[in-house]
Design a protein with these regions (language model features):
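Juxta-kinase regulatory segment immediately upstream of eukaryotic protein kinase catalytic domains
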Residues: 1-32, 220-282
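C-lobe/activation-segment region of protein kinase-like
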Residues: 162-230, 423-487
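Conserved protein kinase catalytic/activation segment
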Residues: 153-164, 415-426
Length: 487
């Protein structure tokens, strides 16, 4: 396998000039694929060493030894506790650059638990969740706490679960009940919020069976899960995607702020406002107004939607130059929804024109989705089963938003697309994460009322939605608040 050019350039930017990285002892490791980059600190790769497939962790910078030792120590704690984890094969220094490398055995034909969860049916997802709870109970019995608890830090092969990423592993003589229950809450928070609603009792029963001495309260774990889920999504969407990180590259100066997803790093994206304006002019206009301009554009083989938020007047400029732009809100909320498992077009880039650091015009780029909006979808004749399934998916989308205390702000039909029977939210600049239940409920009722207005002239469809809302929502209070149901 030949290393892709952009990945070779990543190695070169960190002082390694070839995919065959030389080690201080004269050996070498051939990098085949870069999996993750923490700039100037860590590169995680698939590699070959002495003809054997391995997982390589390259630690760089002044704290390379500290981070390598912490990761190695975590692996040794797992091995000592007989918790399945890839074997540590080599700990060595790099030759050409100040750094350390850890080589771990590759678990061939394994699946990352996160991708497995996302691609499996409900029955397999439940079984995977039970397996992860079982592994977590095993951790806790051994005095081990995984402080970076994500599904992606587990591998699954033939129903066997491997714990990976020693960096987040901490070992204690004994864990308190509070530590274990909080850690369990973190794991539960990684589930789809609807599946947590359905499975939490079963998952907690599994944990109690394996760790009976721990007092596990249903409501406590549910509250912890909600807090961890909201906190993690907000930390990522409100902070992390506005700085350089594994997923995002950021370039900024007095004239611009430019953030783009590394997933689209090979695209020749415009570098200034004038070039974005020119691209919009050359593209298919979807909307042209005083507030914003929307165009369907294409760069290389990638179709995208560019949304430009205009500065309407000098007074408008002075009123908003200190505040977050609506483009930035769209960028943030697109990543928030991705973190929470709610479908939305992939965010590509955020570009803000700056005038001595003050915000001017702003642009949000997202992937273009060829799919009808919800009104156009139902305007076509649909089979009864397909129609009922799509209605249920839409109602479940709103129930997810309710449980997550998220409001969209404008749930007209054109802001919800239907792709292969599944709803997808667009136009996210008014979306809000609510921390206070009263305001969350009030905003959700507004979203529900606006959504149901789309069907006021179609009694059959309106009534079908009402029927589905009654079944899906365990609590009918929000439906009554939105006047969908009466007291």
């Amino acid at each position: 396998m030949t290393l892709a050019l952009n990945q070779l350039q990543t190695l070169q930017a960190h002082g390694m000039h070839t995919s065959a990285v030389p080690l201080a002892d004269g050996d070498s490791v051939v990098i085949q694929q870069i999996v993750r980059v923490v700039p100037s600190r860590r590169i995680v790769c698939r590699a070959l060493w002495r003809g054997q497939a391995v997982f390589a962790k390259i630690f760089l910078g002044t704290r390379a030894n500290e981070y390598a030792e912490r990761d190695k120590r975590g692996v040794m704690h797992l091995l000592a506790a007989h918790i399945p984890t890839p074997t540590l094969l080599l700990d060595a220094e790099l030759k050409e650059v100040n750094g350390r490398i850890l080589l771990l055995a590759s678990v061939d034909d394994s699946d990352n638990a996160e991708s497995l969860y996302q691609t499996s049916d409900a029955a397999k997802r439940l079984q995977l969740s039970l397996s992860l709870v079982e592994v977590l109970a095993m951790h806790h019995r051994a005095g081990i706490l995984q402080t970076d608890l994500y599904f992606k830090n587990f591998l699954v092969k033939d129903d066997k679960v491997y714990t990976i990423d020693g960096d987040g592993i901490r070992n204690y003589a004994a864990l308190s009940d509070a530590q274990m229950v909080n850690n369990l809450g973190v794991l539960i928070s990684k589930l789809d919020v609807l599946e947590e609603e359905a499975w939490l009792k079963t998952l907690l029963e599994k944990y109690r069976t394996l760790n009976p001495q721990v007092v596990v309260d249903f409501n406590q774990v549910k509250a912890l899960s909600k807090n961890h889920r909201t906190s993690a999504a907000s930390s990522y969407a409100d902070k992390k995607v506005f700085r350089i990180c594994t997923d995002i590259e950021v370039q900024t100066d007095a004239q611009r702020f430019f953030a783009f997803a590394r997933l689209f790093s090979t695209l020749a994206l415009p570098q200034c406002a004038a070039d974005y304006d020119a691209l919009i002019t050359q593209s298919v206009l979807l909307k042209s107004g005083n507030t914003c301009t929307v165009a369907h554009a294409q760069i290389s083989d990638t179709e995208m939607v560019i949304k430009r938020y205009n500065v309407k007047s000098l007074g408008h400029f002075f009123g908003r130059m200190w505040r977050q732009t609506r483009a930035a809100a769209s960028w943030s909320n697109a990543h928030r929804l991705q973190q929470l498992g709610i479908s939305t077009p992939k965010p590509i880039a955020l570009f803000e024109q700056r005038i001595f650091g003050l915000r001017g015009k702003a642009y949000f780029l997202s992937e273009y989705i060829e799919a009808p909006d919800v009104a156009a979808y139902f305007a076509h004749e649909r089979g009864s089963l397909e129609r009922a399934a799509t209605i249920k998916q839409l109602v479940q989308l709103f129930y997810r938003l309710y449980l997550l205390r998220l409001s969209h702000g404008d749930t007209k039909a054109s802001n919800i697309k239907i792709q292969q029977g599944m709803p997808m939210l667009i136009d996210l600049d008014s979306m809000k994460q609510h921390n206070i239940p009263f305001y969350a409920a009030k905003a959700h009722a507004r979203d529900l009322r606006r959504f149901m207005q789309n069907w006021k002239d179609d009694t059959s469809l309106y009534n079908a939605f009402v029927k589905s809302f009654k079944v899906v929502y365990a609590d009918h209070a929000p439906l009554k608040q939105a006047d969908i149901l009466s007291d």
